[in-house]
Amino acid sequence: YYVSFMKKSVLISLVLIALGAGLVAYARCAVSSSDSVPAKVEQRLREKAQAGKAYCDKNGYNTNYCFLVDFSIHSGKRRFFVWDFKGDSVKYASLCAHGYGKNSTVSKPVFSNVEGSYCSSLGKYKVDIRSYSKWGINIHYKLHGLEATNDNAFKRYIVLHSYTPLPETEVYPLHLPLGISQGCPVISDEVMRKVDGLLKAEKKPVLLWVYD
């Protein structure tokens, strides 16, 4: 069993290395875009943030920031957002990969809460303890699903982490390739460093909300 597990781990690592090379090429081909968030996207973010703030107030969560992931947005555009409750605005934003399982495509993720599905899961999460990651900046945060659509997240090893080859800038109209995520929200190293700094400074748990 151990040998089989190690072979699988090596294979996954090789696949991700190949994907990394492809992402570098993507970033070179893509048209660079500004850091501004389109008005339509920001309006929906603000609506979600208002609902998120109410949830945080009611459940004793952090009321400085929340993390919002809008999987209805094209994968070549920023769709992970750090929302500043006090400033009522986006503080940081990143590209975000979705899971590749159950016939997900680059343009259309399939969502599932089932172990072994390699799918992203919709719903609210509590961002929990900081731990080592072999990907990105070598840090990840455990996630606990708070709804029926994602309550298997912890035992599925769904975590918030980064991946070094993920571009810092938007690659639209190109999509991010499949294979980067097995269900985890995967973001850029640059934004992960900023997220890590925020989380280390906060005492109360931070809300992460994935929706489409």
Where are each of the predicted segments found?
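Charge-dense polyanion-binding interfaces
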Residues: 206-212
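Coiled-coil-like amphipathic alpha-helices with heptad-repeat character
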Residues: 2-3, 23
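Hydrophobic alpha-helical membrane-insertion segments, chiefly the h-region
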Residues: 18-27
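N-terminal Sec-pathway targeting helices
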Residues: 3-17
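Cell wall/extracellular polymer interaction/catalysis modules
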Residues: 27-182, 189-206
